[in-house]
Amino acid sequence: MQSSVYFDQTGSFASSSDNVVSSTTNTHNISPSHRSSLNLNTTSHPHEASGRGSASGELYLNDTNSPLAISSMLNTLALGSMPQDIASSNISNHDNNIKGSYSLKLSNVAKDITLRECYAIFALAEGVKSIELQKKNSSSSITSASLEDENDIFIIARFELLNLAINYAVILNSKNELFGPSFPNKTTVEIIDDTTKNLVSFPSSAIFNDTSRLNKSNSGMKRPSLLSQRSRFSFSDPFSNDSPLSQQQSQQQQQQPQQPQQHSTQKHSPQQCNQQQVNSSIPLSSQGQVIGLHSNHSHQDLSVESTIQTSDIGKSFLLRDNTEINEKIWGTSGIPSSINGYMSTPQPSTPTLEWGNTSASQHGSSFFLPSAASTAIAPTNSNTSANANASSNNGASNNGANQALSASSQQPMMQIGNTINTSLTSSNSLPPYGLMSSQSQHISNMVNTSDMNITPQKQNRFMQQPQPEHMYPVNQSNTPQKVPPARLSSSRNSHKNNSTTSLSSNITGSASISQADLSLLARIPPPANPADQNPPCNTLYVGNLPSDATEQELRQLFSGQEGFRRLSFRNKNTTSNGHSHGPMCFVEFDDVSFATRALAELYGRQLPRSTVSSKGGIRLSFSKNPLGVRGPNSRRGGSGNPNPNVNMLSSYNSNVGHIKN
């Protein structure tokens, strides 16, 4: 070998006192573990029998400052490894190389334990030399007096390596019921060095698991690159572990801002409930601020929902459930923020009335008090806000309203109020599928300009008032909807007069329209002719009828529908070319809700024929005018009585009589 030749040729260097370190000092400074790793075993050196050269080579190897020793130490270190890996590798190497006799003692065990059970406990342990079942008297040479337990029976397992004893001691110490539920006491685990008779401390199970998991994660991590910053022109390996780690970090960063937003939505929901209660208890004149708060919360909720729903972009709209589609269409989440702002923002032309106003009861001039020349004040009762407002004013508002109505029963201003109410309910800007009751149609049918003490110019002015945007129907309980005052008064006194029984039934029928009916209505395709897109009313137009259709089969088809009232059937006139366009049919129902359900259920129904029509089934749409009513001024009337004076007087007297009772 070159080293031996080198050592033999440099005798002067070996004999020099400046460069040679004594072997006693070197062996004293180097630990036994480092000796074995550096191959500094003096007894097994290959140059042991070579006289002077062997002595010089031995001294040179024992020198820690020699280049060979330094190179061997560097070879044992992993290049680019983390400091944790270096420390753990040194500790593991040190533990693995510490050999001796270590006893693992299990005390506080069951008294009836056998040696077979002791072997079963250590069946999965490695490096076990012997297992004994001893008593306290016979184990006095092994344990000290401080280690004695109350139980005089214990198990001793001897290990050769300390790390194996520590590993199994941690496993046994983590078991609370080592001997099953019949012996619930926790077993005491101790490690004793047989040479020194001292206890050897070992980590607890939680710390040991954390350190082992950390070591595994550190060992499995990719060696960090020397280049901390990569160039944007460099190619990135798609199979490296960096990309999934970066994706997970980005996902965690996206989820973290979403969590406080979800908490904010949960915090907003009780606030909205409280605001709804406040909205139902305050006067209508001061509801603008609360409505503004509703709009602000709606904007926040929509922004939160838009951020949460970004994860569902990849889902196809056709794969969604019908209920989810209906919620998107009819729920508040599907309404744009601008429309929601229009819904909740009160317009200046919105008619309002304060039920608890003392001036109305003191003056007694009229139930309707015009506040300006260009604006009309009419009673506005909604299902949630105004109705709760009228019932939550401690009875004072009800007394004021009753006095005002009794005073107005002998004055002509009640007629003006009915006219104003008619102008509001019969506006031409009604939304599609708006839900109005038959009572509003009945009241609008009562009103005629020739019977009212009001000029046509005033009525036209009332008719030209823009419809408030918040009268667009949304299927929610917190959205105010316009309901005529006669509905409220008649439903309140329905148990006192039999004439209001049908009215209350119509009210419950209109309020009982559910989201399922609206979902059925949403599936109906829009009419091909834009002229057929009429606002909802209680009358349906039946189109696309075959030329041989009869009134009997249509009556049989529609009479089974709930709320069916009557049917009008007639054939169209023959044109000059001799062609007939088929019969024409109108079907009237008790309420708009019944007409809506019938339209949703019977749209596209085929009449029983021997051959299937190529034009498809019947096409239903809302009629331009209710049955028996002509002209735009009195549309939406639900009664076929040609004399509106009788309807007006009878309804007027019945309403006043209900309030007096």
UniProtKB/Swiss-Prot annotation:
Present with 5730 molecules/cell in log phase SD medium. This is Protein WHI3. It comes from Saccharomyces cerevisiae (strain ATCC 204508 / S288c) (Baker's yeast). It holds the Pfam family RRM_1. GO terms for molecular function: mRNA binding. CDD domains: RRM_scw1_like. Residues 538-625 form the RRM domain. The gene is WHI3. Disulfide bonds: none annotated. Residues 14-31, 237-272, 383-409, 496-508, 628-647 have a biased composition (Low complexity). It comes from the Eukaryota. Keywords: Cell cycle, Phosphoprotein, RNA-binding. The keyword Cell cycle applies. The modification Phosphoserine is found at S231. Involved in size control and cell cycle.
